[in-house]
């Protein structure tokens, strides 16, 4: 890239810092007429940087000066004199920039493609028709979906309860998971539950009334159980909640999502469960609450209030657990049973008994949601939704 600068321009290097333009003119002026002398100086100190450019009117004079003065001493220093060349960076600099630019777009495209991935994952969720499958699949698949899925999901459910879901989701999304475990733990951990209970109780009344308001109920309950955080996801209650519950979430995630078609189902579940069957379950719960007999374990659970907590949590939990049925089985069995065990101190059988209720849950959730539940709960859900 080295190009000769304009003819007659010489580079003089190795100058003494004390040498100035006048000295250069005196030395080189004898070779011919000088058009320009550029002594390069430091911008800050204004001292010579030790090199200069001398331009002769005649290129021949420049050659003579270079031949004679190169290597000669000037002000005590040997100087270098040669034909000046254009800085390589000037010519070279312009070319390279474009490549980076050209590169940019690909990146963008790439990013875009990355973005597109989310929906597919969602599709994955969707494919899981079977809740149980979802869980299994989702559990393996779930975690990833969770990450990718939420965004897509946000598109879907959020609208329903977009407001709650959005904010909540974010908190629940991140916090949710931990909360989930926490939630579950909280399940286990009375402390959280107690606060929830109060809230829940509040919810309960609404629930009882609002109960029907599955949405409010779900969101409410859920929120109560999950501090709204998880439930806030209620919009995505199902999903989110599922999400919220880390395991459930994972399980659910895909399920929730997956079922987003299924999701609808899930939703049916969750909503439904919350709305219809859920409500039923809940009512049963409520009944259990009121009437321990219905769900023996529940009452023993920890008292109706606790039970409520449980139920709400569980319901909220379970509800959102569309998977409720399977997840529930999984989560429930694991989470809830665990919880149940810890909290309830119920014998394993009882815990297991839970699952049956769970089954009933599933049946009620599932049955209701799928059958009348879907229609009815859906309508309920619709109502709830409209509320939001």
From Swiss-Prot:
Residues 60-80, 191-212, 238-271, 335-344, 377-388 have a biased composition (Basic and acidic residues). Its main location: nucleus. GO terms for cellular component: catalytic step 2 spliceosome; euchromatin; extracellular exosome; nucleus; supraspliceosomal complex. There is a cross-link at residue 80 (Glycyl lysine isopeptide (Lys-Gly) (interchain with G-Cter in SUMO2)). The keyword Hydrolase does not apply. The modification Phosphoserine is found at residue 88. The keyword Acetylation does not apply. Disulfide bonds: none annotated. InterPro entries: Nucleotide-bd_a/b_plait_sf, RBD_domain_sf, RBM, RBM1CTR, RRM_dom, RRM_dom_euk. Keywords: Isopeptide bond, mRNA processing, mRNA splicing, Nucleus, Phosphoprotein, Ribonucleoprotein, RNA-binding, Ubl conjugation. Residues 59-388 are annotated as: Disordered. Coiled coil: none annotated. GO terms for biological process: cellular response to interleukin-1; membrane protein ectodomain proteolysis; mRNA processing; negative regulation of mRNA splicing, via spliceosome; positive regulation of mRNA splicing, via spliceosome; positive regulation of transcription by RNA polymerase II; protein homooligomerization; regulation of alternative mRNA splicing, via spliceosome. Residues 148-161 have a biased composition (Pro residues). Residues 320-334, 359-368 have a biased composition (Low complexity). It is found in: Nucleus. GO terms for molecular function: chromatin binding; mRNA binding; RNA binding; RNA polymerase II cis-regulatory region sequence-specific DNA binding. Residues 8-86 form the RRM domain. RNA-binding protein which may be involved in pre-mRNA splicing. This is RNA binding motif protein, X-linked-like-1. The gene is Rbmxl1.
């Amino acid at each position: 890239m080295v190009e000769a600068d304009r003819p007659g321009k010489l580079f003089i290097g190795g100058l003494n810092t004390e040498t100035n333009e006048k000295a250069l003119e005196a030395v080189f002026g004898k070779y011919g007429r000088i058009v320009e002398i550029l002594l390069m100086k430091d911008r800050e100190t204004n001292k010579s940087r030790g090199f200069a450019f001398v331009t002769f009117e005649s290129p021949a004079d420049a050659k003579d000066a270079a031949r004679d003065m190169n290597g000669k001493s000037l002000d005590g220093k040997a100087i270098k004199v040669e034909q000046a060349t254009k800085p390589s960076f000037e010519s070279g600099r312009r070319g390279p920039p474009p490549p980076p630019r050209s590169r940019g777009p690909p990146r963008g495209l790439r990013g875009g493609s990355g973005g597109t991935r989310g929906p597919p994952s969602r599709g994955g969720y969707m494919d899981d028709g079977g809740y149980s499958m979802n869980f299994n699949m989702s559990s393996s698949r779930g975690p990833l979906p969770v990450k990718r899925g939420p965004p897509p999901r946000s598109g879907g459910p959020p609208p329903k309860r977009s407001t709650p879901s959005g904010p909540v989701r974010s908190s629940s999304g991140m916090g949710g998971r931990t909360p989930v475990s926490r939630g579950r733990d909280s399940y286990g951990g009375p402390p959280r539950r107690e606060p929830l209970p109060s809230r829940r109780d509040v919810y309960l009344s609404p629930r009882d009334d609002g109960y029907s308001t599955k949405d409010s109920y779900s969101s409410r309950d859920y929120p109560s159980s999950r501090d709204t955080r998880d439930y806030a996801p209620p919009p995505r209650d199902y999903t989110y909640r599922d999400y919220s519950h880390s395991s459930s979430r994972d399980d659910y995630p895909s399920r929730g999502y997956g079922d987003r078609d299924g999701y609808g189902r899930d939703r049916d579940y969750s909503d439904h469960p919350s709305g219809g069957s859920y409500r039923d379950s809940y009512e049963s719960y409520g009944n259990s609450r009121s009437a321990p007999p219905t769900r023996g374990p529940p009452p023993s659970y920890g008292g109706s209030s606790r039970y409520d907590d449980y139920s709400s949590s569980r319901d909220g939990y379970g509800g959102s657990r569309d998977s409720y049925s399977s997840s529930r089985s999984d989560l429930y069995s694991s989470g809830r049973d665990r919880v149940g065990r810890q909290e309830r101190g119920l014998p394993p059988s009882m815990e297991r008994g839970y699952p049956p209720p769970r089954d009933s849950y599933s049946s009620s959730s599932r049955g209701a949601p799928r059958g009348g539940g879907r229609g009815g709960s859906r309508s309920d859900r619709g109502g709830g939704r409209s509320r939001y």
